[in-house]
């Protein structure tokens, strides 16, 4: 709740797809991941910062492998993080928008001293973000990294339905049918 209440709305990307709703749901999934994975308070806070600001580098909706890199450049200014935490945060945020096979090279680029911690935060961010793909009718559990995330798939659907209902938005936004018509997701994230 604290992460949502203290969210810096001014830096979020404004969008029906990657805007506030997506960020709030990603924060919820991140918080649940932190509980499921028994993260420390420090790692929970770091993961929630990553969930909150992972899309601040977006300039458009759609497939964009570079927005994480742009977000990584600014995330220290937004969160006030420094040192090792900032390195891990930058690495996780950049890795979230890249293909799975590129994760390790992205993490290596930032040289965190605790690579296992960096990889853990990056994987949990990718799963929290991925669980909200229900909003675009494109959640595939084969792309989730953690068993706890796979088990949360039904919750992701319910969270999305309740969120949309509470805020008075359609369950299938107008952009989804057109997007589904044109998508070609085979091998995109491999």
At which residue positions do the language-model features occur?
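His-Asp-centered metal-binding catalytic motifs of divalent-metal-dependent phosphohydrolases/nucleases
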Residues: 42-62, 67-71, 75, 89-99, ...
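Amphipathic alpha-helical segments within well-ordered protein domains
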Residues: 31, 72-79
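Short helix-capping segments at alpha-helix termini
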Residues: 79-85
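Short alpha-helical hairpin
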Residues: 1-9
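Exposed alpha-helical structural elements
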Residues: 2, 46, 88, 92, ...
């Amino acid at each position: 709740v604290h992460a949502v209440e203290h969210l810096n709305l001014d830096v979020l990307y404004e969008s029906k797809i990657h805007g506030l709703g997506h960020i709030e749901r990603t924060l919820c999934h991140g918080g649940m991941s932190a509980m499921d994975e028994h993260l420390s308070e420090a790692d929970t806070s770091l993961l929630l910062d990553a969930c909150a600001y992972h899309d601040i580098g977006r300039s458009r909706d759609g497939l964009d492998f570079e927005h994480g890199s742009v977000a990584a450049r600014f995330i220290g200014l937004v969160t006030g993080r420094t040192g090792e935490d900032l390195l891990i945060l930058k690495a996780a945020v950049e890795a979230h928008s890249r293909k799975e096979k590129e994760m390790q090279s992205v993490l290596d680029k930032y040289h965190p001293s605790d690579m296992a911690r960096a990889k853990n935060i990056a994987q949990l961010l990718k799963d929290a973000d991925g669980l909200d793909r229900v909003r675009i009718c494109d959640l595939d559990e084969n792309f989730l990294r953690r068993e706890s995330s796979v088990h949360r798939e039904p919750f992701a659907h319910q969270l999305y339905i309740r969120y949309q209902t509470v805020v008075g938005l359609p369950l299938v936004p107008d952009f989804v049918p057109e997007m589904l018509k044109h998508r070609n997701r085979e091998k995109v994230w491999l």
